[in-house]
Structure formats: C-alpha cells, structure tokens
Curated annotation (Swiss-Prot):
SUPFAM superfamilies: Tubulin C-terminal domain-like (SSF55307), Tubulin nucleotide-binding domain-like (SSF52490). It catalyses: GTP + H2O = GDP + phosphate + H(+). SMART domains: Tubulin, Tubulin_C. InterPro entries: Alpha_tubulin, Tub_FtsZ_C, Tubulin, Tubulin/FtsZ-like_C, Tubulin/FtsZ_2-layer-sand-dom, Tubulin/FtsZ_GTPase_sf, Tubulin_C, Tubulin_CS. It comes from the Eukaryota. This is Tubulin alpha chain. Its cofactor is Mg(2+). It comes from Candida albicans (Yeast). Tubulin is the major constituent of microtubules, a cylinder consisting of laterally associated linear protofilaments composed of alpha- and beta-tubulin heterodimers. Microtubules grow by the addition of GTP-tubulin dimers to the microtubule end, where a stabilizing cap forms. Below the cap, tubulin dimers are in GDP-bound state, owing to GTPase activity of alpha-tubulin. The gene is TUB1. One of its GO terms (biological process) is microtubule-based process. The record marks Y448 as: Involved in polymerization. GO terms for molecular function: GTP binding; hydrolase activity; metal ion binding; structural constituent of cytoskeleton.
C-alpha cells in the first residue's frame, strides 16, 4: 500500500481541500456519508487505488486520509455542517479560537504553536494507520497568516519527524492584481524562505491566472472562490490520479520530484491544464490529444501568470487522463518539440515524461466546467517562473524600504533580521533560476 496524507492549512487550504475531496468522492463512487453508491461493491480505481487516499472502516465506510487545520473556526465549521460532514473523521478537523490576522509571525510563533502538538499527534495517529506511507500533500496559501505561518511551521516539523517521506505542496500564490491583504509580499517571502529546504516539490497556483481562465474559458463574468477552487481541484485530481487509478504509466509521489526537480532549490513546477471549457462550448470542441497538448504550452492555460516563451524548460511531465493512446501522445510531443517556441535547456535534451491514466476526468456536480473524454495536466519546471518571484520581491522591497507594517511581526516575537535573511534567500533563488537557464556550452568558445 502506498498511502498519502493530505493536510489542508488555513482558509484557502481548507476550501480547496473541500473541492478536492468532493471531486475524489465522485471519482471513486463514494457518497457524501462515506458509503458506496448503489450498485458498486468496490470503489472505482481498483483495490490499491482508492486506499492511497481513503481508509476503510469495519462497517464499509470510507474515510479520507485528510487533516483540516485553521486558527479560526469559521471555515472548519462549514465542513462540520456541510454536505460532506459525515465523510470526515471529527478529530481530523482541528480549529483554533483566534485567527492569525494575516500575520506570518502569529501563525508561526505565537498562535500557531499553541495547536501544533494537537496537529502532530493527529498526523502521527494517521500515519500509524498506513502500511507504507508515501508522503504528504500540503495545500495552503502563501499570502495569508495561517497558511504561511502555520503551514511553514508544520512543514518544518514534518521534515524532522518524517525526513524520508515526500512532501508536495499546492501553494496559492498572491495574484499580481487581485490582492486580499496588504502584507501578502511579507508573508510570501517569509514562508518561501522557511519551506524552501523542507518541501520537495511546490506546485504554485495564482488566483489571477485562474480568474482569467474562468472568465475566458468558462464564461463566468464574476468568478467566485468556489469556481476557482473547482478548477484547482481538477488540477490536483489530475496530479494525484496516477496514484489513485490504474494506468499504463504510473507515477508515484517520489517520481514527481525525480523527474521534475534537477536541483533541490529549483522545485517550483509550472502547472497547466487542458481542456477547460463550459458546457455550452463542449459540443463544439474536437479535444484531440494533439490539441490539448498544444493548449498546455499556451500562457492562457497556466495556473501562474508568467510567459513560458521567455524561459527554458528543464523538465516536463505530461499527465494524461481518459481515452488516450500512447501513439497519439508520442505524435503530439514530437509536434511540440519541433516548434521553436518550446526551448529546452541544453543540459537536459530529453525533457518529457509521460503518464497515462485510463480513468476519464469527472466534473464536480453543479460546476461550470464541462466533463471531457480526455484531459492533460502539464507540470513543467521552467525558468519563466522566476518572473513570479521577481514580482513579489519588488513589492516586498517597496514596503520594507519604509519598514511598513514590520512592527506587527516584531511584536509577535519575530526578529527584524529574519526579513533580510528571507529576502536574501529569495534573491539567491532568482539567481539560481538565471544560472540554470544559461547554456552550459556557449557557442563562441571553440578553444581546445
């Protein structure tokens, strides 16, 4: 058995977690009360598949291997009273009494530490129920107080307690134009610095990029958070589909980092997903393998605002689902490689890993997204993502040059030196990206 424990931290983490578990339940044929749908004697996905994410009780109920953590009770109360309230184990929903007030230091040093032992105790019990724990899947935002502060604290502790296990993050990155709090740049830089050596692979998701996808592809004039979360859930589901269903090329958690992370610090793959279209457009789309593969290389299908045409690809994973044949995939990849727009770094010429899972994608009931017979999720480690770091670093510098809002952090027991240390670490990260993008054999040097 290769189990995975999902940990959702903070408001964004918990709400994305809700959308994901609703989708997983539908994909495996599990009802909101945890029992199987009529006519099924086993969950869809084979004996091995569903047990990576669900544990089975003696009465035949399926319980998610998931933990919800927040410093204020509102979001977790929604889970406790929502449609899926009977699905989760009540002790796996952990809420504090007061929130982190968008302050990394409150989540990391003061309020967050008070509930840390409860969380770790619960994680320990969940890992004891696993035969062969594969790793952790972390969902949180980088801009909030709980997601950044408590999220990074928890990752640090898990590194100490479960050093060899994989730790994958889905991190909501602050959107360039759509901001929910003034101090997002501080929280993002501080949490990235703290988690850089603890997370093995971080898939970033940026609200603005997803807003644009909802507006452009799903015809939603004013997308709300549930529309965004349903789209993010599709991506998370595609990334984890190979762990939950049978396919010709199965990928496990360790394989992601082996294939995508050339150096430990450069572990921020760019995520693209196709096809994304509304029900009204569904009948007009051909949706062939080569079409959806090409779409993944267009900036409009990416989960982070940056231009991949300006960067170079170090490694790429294409995870297909549904009615897909290997020959079609090979042709589609050959087509992409022949185009000049896709540049690979010269020290990694092969660059493409393919995963195929035969379970077709499912759309969440009531969501605007139409279900398709096949879909692809592309994870690519490209130097273009450095653009996202440059943006947030610039905002950090503007505020920190005036020491704006710093007293709130220092008042919670943080030292001012941590700000400069974190900023220097991110400057080093930007330099790392520039370095890996430069050619290892410049053409002009022909001396022997």
């Amino acid at each position: 058995m290769r189990e995975v424990i999902s940990i959702n931290v903070g408001q964004a983490g918990c709400q994305i977690g809700n959308a994901c578990w609703e989708l997983y339940s539908q994909e495996h044929g599990i009802r909101p009360d945890g029992y199987l749908q009529e006519g099924l004697d086993r969950p869809k996905g084979g004996e091995e598949g569903f047990s990576t994410f669900f544990s089975e009780t003696g009465s035949g109920k399926y319980v998610p291997r998931a933990l919800y953590v927040d410093l204020e009770p509102n979001v977790i109360d929604e889970v406790r009273t929502g449609v899926y309230k009977d699905l989760f184990h009540p002790e796996q929903l952990i809420a504090g009494k007061e929130d982190a007030a968008n302050n990394y230091a409150r989540g990391h040093y003061t309020v967050g530490r008070e509930i840390l032992d409860d969380i770790l105790d619960r994680v320990r019990r969940m890992s004891d129920q696993c035969d062969g724990l594969q790793g952790f899947l972390f969902t949180h935002s980088l801009g909030g107080g709980t997601g950044s502060g408590l999220g990074s604290l928890l990752l640090e502790q898990l590194s100490l307690d479960y050093g060899k296990k994989s730790k994958l993050e889905f991190a909501v990155y602050p959107a360039p134009q759509v901001s929910t709090s003034v101090v997002e740049p501080y929280n993002t830089v501080l949490t990235t610095h703290t988690t850089l050596e603890h997370a093995d692979c971080t898939f970033m998701v940026d609200n603005e990029a997803i807003y644009d996808m909802c507006r452009r592809n799903l015809d939603i004039a004013r997308p709300n958070f549930s529309s965004l979360n349903n789209l993010i859930a599709q991506v998370v589901s595609s990334v984890t589909a190979s762990l939950r269903f049978d396919g010709s090329l199965n990928v496990d958690l360790n394989e992601f980092q082996t294939n995508l992370v050339p150096y430990p610090r450069i572990h921020f793959p760019l995520v693209s997903y196709a096809p994304v279209f509304s029900k009204s457009r569904a009948t007009h789309e051909a949706n062939s393998v080569s079409e959806i593969t090409q779409s993944c290389f267009e900036p409009g299908n990416q989960m982070v605002k940056c231009d991949p045409r300006t960067g170079k690809y170090m490694a790429t994973c294409l995870l297909y689902r549904g009615d897909v044949v290997t020959r079609d995939v090979q042709n589609a990849v050959a087509q992409v490689k022949s185009k000049k727009t896709v540049q690979l770094v010269d020290w990694c010429p092969t660059g493409f890993k393919i995963g195929i899972c035969y379970q077709p994608p499912t759309a969440i009931k009531g969501s605007e997204l139409a279900s398709a017979s096949r879909a692809v999720c592309m994870l690519s480690n490209t130097t273009a993502i450095a653009e996202a770091w440059r943006r947030i670093d610039r905002k950090f510098d503007l505020m920190y040059s005036k020491r704006a809002f710093v007293h709130w952090y220092v008042g919670e027991g943080m030292e001012e030196g941590e700000f400069t240390e974190a900023r220097e670490d991110l400057a080093a990260l930007e330099r790392d990206y520039i370095e890996v993008g430069t050619d290892s054999f410049p053409e002009e040097e022909e001396e022997y």
